[in-house]
Amino acid sequence: MIVGIGIDIIELNRIEKMIDGKLKFMERILTESERNVAKGLKGSRLTEFVAGRFAAKEAYSKAVGTGIGKEVSFLDIEVRNDDRGKPILITSTEHIVHLSISHSKEFAVAQVVLESSSR
């Protein structure tokens, strides 16, 4: 049973401005593991990576129903890729998490669906 749905869209140029020489933004948004991946990226690929993670984490917080804040922080949520490249969301939730991330020339968007783990 679906217990939550969240979606977020972010302008790539907004993220590009925030990461331009500002390590604090990356430390606030990305986990250590995500920052290690980001170190190997440059230019538009780095912007897409950070924007996708930002949107995924915002979408998750909306699906949970709290938003980013005291109960859920950016660093409580990690986005990884499975063996086939599919994004997966790592968090402490008991729910099954379905994540989709997409990019266009101007935007990154993510959708999260939370499913009850009991069948």
Swiss-Prot record:
Gene Ontology CC: one annotated term: cytosol
Binding residues annotated for Mg(2+), in chain numbering: D8, E58
Enzyme class: transferase
Pfam family, one: ACPS
GO molecular function term, any single one: holo-[acyl-carrier-protein] synthase activity
Catalytic activity: apo-[ACP] + CoA = holo-[ACP] + adenosine 3',5'-bisphosphate + H(+)
Keyword Transferase: yes
Names of the cofactor(s): Mg(2+)
Lipid metabolism in keyword set: yes
Primary location recorded for the protein, binned into one broad class: cytoplasm
UniProt GO BP: fatty acid biosynthetic process; lysine biosynthetic process via aminoadipic acid
Top-level taxon of origin: Bacteria
EC number: 2.7.8.7
Cross-referenced InterPro entries: 4-PPantetheinyl_Trfase_dom, 4-PPantetheinyl_Trfase_dom_sf, ACPS, P-Pant_transferase_sf, Ppantetheine-prot_Trfase_dom
Coiled-coil portions: none
Subcellular location: Cytoplasm
Family named by the database record: Belongs to the P-Pant transferase superfamily. AcpS family.
Function: Transfers the 4'-phosphopantetheine moiety from coenzyme A to a Ser of acyl-carrier-protein.
The name this protein goes by in its record: Holo-[acyl-carrier-protein] synthase
